[in-house]
Regions:
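N-terminal redox-cofactor-binding region of secreted/periplasmic oxidoreductases
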Residues: 1-177
Length: 177
């Protein structure tokens, strides 16, 4: 993750076709999709896809986790995994029932809300859809802004959050080939 473009959010688009940091995977041609192949960017750097993705922080719908538990996956209900989400976060909003602080992953709200995005959210609300100011809180449905894995204008990848603080440990060896 030595490229400055990995750490600067504006660099997001530079990685779609960069074989140095992206495995350049795509789906098989889909007959129902006009035989198109859909590009699936996957990170080929320390931090994996968290180093080249769009930095959107959404944990997933709590009912998905609860369904995994109902299918027999002990330890995977939303209540089971929520403490780990909270522990992983350094939430800009502060600590509460759904969010944690002090973790390795910086999570923040968008700092510049575009008028067109605001109009879209307002239109959804006017059409009867709920506005949601926290998709990682009590409810995951509705329209609103998602949070980012970014702090002070820099990406918070797993390499930055987890590996960088541990890189000098005597019991850690990082192999990249």
């Amino acid at each position: 993750d030595r490229s400055p473009w990995i750490h600067i959010p504006l660099g997001y688009g530079k990685h779609f076709s960069n074989a140095a940091v992206n495995w350049l995977y795509s789906t098989a041609a889909n007959p129902e999709g006009l035989n198109r192949r859909v590009v699936q960017p996957r990170g080929k750097v320390l931090g994996g896809s968290s180093a080249i993705n769009g930095m959107v922080y959404i944990r997933g719908h709590k009912e998905d986790y609860n369904q995994w538990r109902q299918l027999g996956n002990t330890g995977w209900s939303y209540e089971d995994v929520l403490p780990y989400f909270r522990k992983a976060e350094d939430q800009q909003r502060g600590e509460d029932e759904y969010h944690g602080v002090g973790g390795p992953l910086a999570v923040s709200d968008p700092y510049d809300k575009h008028p067109l995005a605001e109009a879209f959210i307002d239109a959804a609300e006017a059409a009867g859809h709920p506005r949601n100011d926290d998709f990682n809180g009590a409810d995951q449905t509705g329209f609103g802004y998602s949070q980012w894995t970014m702090r002070n204008g820099r990406r918070s990848s797993t390499a930055v959050g987890y590996l960088k603080p541990a890189r000098k440990r005597p019991n850690l060896t990082v192999a990249t080939e």
